[in-house]
């Protein structure tokens, strides 16, 4: 009898959750667009007169970093500017890039590593949860790995939360995905 009640309560809980509207907050970088931007940047670097003999290169390392290398700091800054222009044209947000220190390489050449931020770090996720709670919105916010899920019975609450987060500077590009309504 008690097991049947617990099972029925579990079914009711699932039904109640199914009536909630929800969306996920993510921060992803489209790696294919990054590759395309790197290819375009390399093409422009090869064609530019001031960078022709600079031995500049841009490489994608795995799915989480870009390696820049050039003959000097001036050339590296020019390469970085070209890459940033191409990334913006391809729709990749510069907020998701973290620049490493300039490192000396062989001879006079220098290199720099740029990390791509994939997912929402835990401290940023906690900040998002705190923002929603402080706004006194009737919504449940949960951290699921590198994603934050927001659910509420009222769609207008979810729209207000999206507007609140878009209006805030979080230090990384947020995307709102998996919007589910009933």
Language model region names:
Residues 18-19, 23, 111-182:
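Positively charged, low-complexity, intrinsically disordered RNA-binding extensions
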Residues 21, 54-56, 62-64, 95, ...:
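A generic structural signal for short beta-strands and their flanking turns/coil linkers
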Residues 28, 32-35, 43, 47-55, ...:
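Short Lys/Arg-rich amphipathic alpha-helical segments
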Residues 28-37, 116-122:
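Short, surface-exposed ligand-recognition loops at beta-strand->loop->(often short) alpha-helix junctions
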Residues 49-56, 94-100, 125-137:
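Short amphipathic beta-strand starts and helix->beta connectors
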Residues 61-73, 144-154:
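Short glycine/threonine-rich beta-strand-turn micro-motifs
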Residues 75-113:
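Helix-adjacent hinge/juxtasegments
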């Amino acid at each position: 009898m008690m097991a049947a009640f617990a099972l029925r309560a579990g079914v009711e809980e699932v039904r109640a959750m199914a009536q909630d509207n929800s969306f996920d907050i993510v921060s992803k970088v489209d790696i294919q667009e990054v590759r395309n931007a790197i290819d375009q940047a390399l093409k422009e670097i090869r064609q530019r007169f001031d960078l022709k003999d600079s031995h500049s290169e841009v490489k994608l390392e795995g799915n989480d970093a870009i390696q820049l290398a050039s003959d000097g700091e001036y050339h590296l800054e020019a390469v970085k500017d070209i890459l940033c222009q191409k990334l913006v044209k391809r729709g990749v947000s510069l907020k998701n890039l973290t620049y490493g220190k300039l490192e000396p390489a062989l001879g006079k050449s220098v290199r720099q590593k740029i990390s791509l931020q994939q997912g929402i770090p835990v401290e940023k996720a906690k900040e998002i949860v705190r923002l929603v709670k402080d706004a006194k919105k009737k919504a449940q916010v949960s951290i699921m790995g590198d994603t934050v899920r927001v659910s509420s019975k009222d769609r207008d609450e979810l729209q207000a939360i999206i507007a609140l987060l878009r209006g805030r500077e979080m230090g990384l590009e947020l995307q709102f995905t998996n919007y589910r309504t009933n």
